[in-house]
Amino acid sequence: MDYKHVDIQKLIELAKYDNYAQEEIVERMIVGQVKHDLWKNINPFDWENLFEKCYSNPKYVFVLLCAYKSIFLCKIDPKIPTSNTIIYLEKIHPIVKQQAKNCDVLSQNNLGFMYEEGIGTEIKINKAKMWYTLSANQGLSFAQYNLGYYYYNKAKYEKSINYFQKSAQSGYYLSNFMLAETYLKLSIPNFNEAIKNYLLAANQGCNISQYRLGMIYFEGKYVNTDMNQAYKWFKLSAKQGNYFSQYGLGRVYYSMDSTKYNCQKAINCFIKSANCGHIYAQKKLIEYYEINNNIAEMIYWCVKSSDVDKIKKYIKINENIENTSDIVYFDLVRKNLEDVGSDILYKCQLLIIQNKYFWKDNVSLCRVKLCEKLENIILKFIDWTNKLQNNSLLLLSCLSFIDDNHNVSIRHHQHTTGLIPYVKQHEFRNKKFITFDKENVSFVNEIIDITNGTDMNEWFESLQFLKLNYQNLMKTSMNSSRIYKDLILIQNLETDIEKYCELMFDEIEYGVYDRNRLFIENREYNMAKLFDN
């Protein structure tokens, strides 16, 4: 395989156990062919024999530090074993220090970064600056960039520009981006140089520069407003995963002044950006769904953005929530659910065994399938019970819609679109219960259908078919006592399933106080913040 022509993503996939893939990634990073945004994907911490290679090759140390910066310092992937990595870096530090003292230019830059971030040693900014300077003065673009960034943070912009320019001349595109940022920080901003350097970086694929250009053309900063240019740069940046640009692209689509106006495309862009946590995209969606009377989606984005004040306009706390008046009965319901659930499952499985291994008539296999279908229904009921007892976001009575028309609107939207809403209020036994999360709403829709008798027929019909099948068996079998025994088992099973369903309905009614408590105590869920006051 010619690794020099392999796509970077493929190299990343191969690198864990492939030395040649590792070498190619390292070389590409050293010459700046790997975009900064991909560093977090490389994750060399899993590479075979990585730390042994770091002892002898400063390039591997550089890659390790780049990954450390992208993953650990940005807190991208907490699953990576930080403690082990830090131990290894502490062991590597004296090796890097010795290599730097031996005038290895890349090691000097590596050591500067380790001092700057406190990697394998204490943070020592002055030493970091010293080693960066030694490396930068020998022409290493990474060190020149790091030194430029050091002066940028110190607000020494003239010195910062000097080092960013040197780094940019070596082809390091991030230096062009930082040059642009620095020109705008000057006491008299140099807009022309800023835009020039944004363009240089953007044309090399720097998505942050592409985003900045999109904003400049969209807002008409330093140049005339140009929606087509804004669209171009936002789209290029968004394709690389920049969710700020995704929001910007949405704004272009949403603008009535733009030839690209497309409301649905705008909403799709806002959703992508909002799902990455962009607060303004979330607010745009709240505004859009409120105007269009899609109350459930509006509340979803209110929850995502912690907009409790907006939620309070639609959902209220029910202050006078009674605690269950019969704790003993509630405990009995819970115990009976467990006992009856185990019993009906046992009876159903007993019928399966009977028809698989005892009865040998022509339709025994048909009865097995009926029993297995019934078994799946019983298991579903048991799973429902577990959800009712452990999910704190469904069938709550502590909250309700301020205006019943909100729930009517949600039901109408579900009926016309077929889409499950994020929040919905159901009525059961003349009481109102509210549920959050689409999966939960779908579940509650199903269970409420059973309480209304809509889906009750599924298990009931299976039992009737079983009874009929056994009655036909009596005409051909001599073992009538065994048949009667199975028929009694079926009758008992029917009675017990009815009892289990009734107990499950009691769980909805009497278990609500437990669900309310779990909901209010769940401080990680933004809706629970309604109770903060």
From Swiss-Prot:
It comes from the Viruses. Keywords: Repeat. Sel1-like repeats lie at residues 105-140, 141-172, 173-206, 207-242, 243-278. The keyword tRNA-binding does not apply. Pfam families: Sel1. Gene3D superfamilies: Tetratricopeptide repeat domain. This is Putative sel1-like repeat-containing protein L21. It comes from Acanthamoeba polyphaga mimivirus.
